[in-house]
């Protein structure tokens, strides 16, 4: 499988490798992964992607994968439609060219296959198989071959054209390419005679044009308002019209004409005359094929007018030929019906008038033409004088002269002339039959004006080119449309005209030559004629009566005018004023409406911008979400593909994957695939073991049985083999002995023959040794000298070589020693660093463990203190409620809480019980009385608990020494940095606990009560006594300062203080807002009256010792613990 993310260059190289080994599908998958990967799509230029795209499309064409090619083309369009349109155009043209080449090759292959089949057997051309096949399917060999070989490629080419048109339909940069491909598709339909595909192509182009007309606001969209776009669309529709006419698809041709007319009407530029001439010519042809002679003649007349006006180099022969064509087409129009409204009772869809009006719009006519109007227009244009003498006579005979006895003979001579010269009058031949029908109708009408009755035989003699059946049909049609009054008597074989005087032929004068009116016409107009004659007679008998009546009427009119002229003048003035007022009112309304419309438009535009911005933001969020999902999905798919690729490399993995399809693999993840792989592996192992066991048992039984059966056969075979081997050995040995004896004899005879040559050999050797002795001695001396020199040279080289080897060995040893020392130093340094890191780690772990233990202790203390305080508060709340009821019953006089005269001075720095005894009669007095009645055992327990907490704090952290008296040490560790807190005033809960918990609460409410002077005084006291302030000292005042701050009485603070006290009693004990008012219940100070201006300075009193305030410590611990628990919640 292809890797998930490959660079385009690598993908192209890998695809070429797959193609070389004969795996085009793998190559296509590799390239397809690149286009599906959004990572590389927009990171490379067309020089890198274009070769990849050509290879991709080549593989799609080879494998006939049109849908995969469509996906790649759309991706490529999105990448380069705004960057490099030429690259996109080259890619699309190359793709279509490859598809066309393969289709043409398939067509040639199909023809060649048929030729081979036809020439296979010249002696037996019609085989039984071919005869049966032609009888069954009715197709010849070429059709079957085309269906098998050519048709798949034709389908692929058609899909390619459709995909490219869909790809480029909304891109203004590729508009010319779109129309070129449309023309190529038309040529394809013509070449392969694909009529159904041509209809679908026309519908597709019409749908594209409608989409362009509907929406033209896109960035790369095609605008129909541009002149270039309109011209391209017009040219394409004209080409479509030509193709439809060639394929004889007249319905599609008519739709194309409607599209062309719409484009010409939409265009601001007048179409060129050549285009209009082509349009009228094709329109006339379509009307002719549709059998609509009236509009066919009208289209030819428009073409004649256009050509005559705009074509300057028109010859006389061309003008005469065109005029004859127009004149004959106009005269061939069937005579109209007298009452066409009868057709509306027969038609099922639209009325004929609506259809005619629609067709007249295509010709640019204000109203539908008629035969009379066309003949009148022909005469106005002087067409009869432009044609030859024969056609001029034809017009006169049909429309001017009244000669029924010779009419058909004259027309027949014209018809013979047209038929005789077919080469020159090819365009006029289709009008012959229509011309004959019109001639017969003219003959019948003229005969009806001359004769009351006539025989069939005589009428057929007057109409030689018509038989009796056609004549009777025309007579019935005339009666059906109420053109004439005709009665046929078959018994006498005669025809009667105008016998019914109660019926009229028509209400207007008929067209054509007329001799006289019919009797029914005369009867119908008799009353009109009588009225005319009587009026003329009265005017003759009384010539002055009419003049007197006119004079009298004139005098009455003048008198009436003088009577009403003033009133009428005032009415006119009043009307003029009303009109002016109305105009002003309408103008104001229009201005107001325009302003309102402008405001509304502005508001709508603003809302649209906001909606668009919101939509863009939503789309951006949606894209980001989809991108994130796609990335996650891509990671999963990558992991899955890697796992599948890894599994597919094994035999059992391939077997497991073959059982799953692509959808099944996509539904699984990597773990499930691995699990199935292991299951498949285990199953294969079990199957293999069982097969091996059964095979082993089978082979064991088979071998044992085989060997038992082979024993007697082997014994018999061995006995026979021994006998044969003995015989063979004896024969071979005898042959060997004979050969050895013969060789011995030959060797002895050879030796005896050569003994006589020994003396000559010895003499030759002795002579040769004597001759070569001196030469041998000389060469031996030279060799010894060269040997000595070579020995010296090699000894010197060995000395130099050994010296260099010793030097290199010394350098290597020295370098190794240096490396060894550096390595020892490095190892020692690393050991020291590891030891230091280990020590730091152990130290951090010890500190973390110690901190955790301290936190555990602190948390246990806080939970215990919080639980106790909560119990005390609940109990105190119950007691407060009881005491309040009792005090309300005993109280005699109501007195405001904030009275300055009854507000006591600040409580001394003693315990909380003494402060409660000196408090005024109020809710605070009730609480002090209630606290005195508390159980002594509970107070002792709290004191013991406070002492234990203090001792543990002292042991855990060093005590912080403050010179301002009495602020106990804080054992809490600040969990997060906070902003500098403001000091708490002397309100409720203003004890020492405010210092440690303010960073959690974000400030104290009492700060708003105390004012700036309290803050300045407190700030000065801290600076004088505490030295530099730290972050953990920015809380409220210390508990030993609180009684001093509460001294005096301030009437400004008393309402708020009273409300706060009441609020403390109303709120439940567990409420978070109750924390601020919980201080005074068990702590010293806070909430009492007193004036802050008269309060003594904190440094005037000696701060009490910490151990003298166990109750304060308990309050602090409880308060901080509660706020700590709130923070944790």
Swiss-Prot record:
RNA-binding component of the eukaryotic translation initiation factor 3 (eIF-3) complex, which is involved in protein synthesis of a specialized repertoire of mRNAs and, together with other initiation factors, stimulates binding of mRNA and methionyl-tRNAi to the 40S ribosome. The eIF-3 complex specifically targets and initiates translation of a subset of mRNAs involved in cell proliferation. One of its GO terms (biological process) is translation reinitiation. This is Eukaryotic translation initiation factor 3 subunit A. Component of the eukaryotic translation initiation factor 3 (eIF-3) complex. The eIF-3 complex interacts with pix. One of its GO terms (cellular component) is multi-eIF complex. PROSITE patterns: PCI. HAMAP family: eIF3a. The gene is eIF3a. InterPro entries: EIF3A, eIF3a_PCI_TPR-like, PCI_dom. The keyword ATP-binding does not apply. It comes from Drosophila mojavensis.
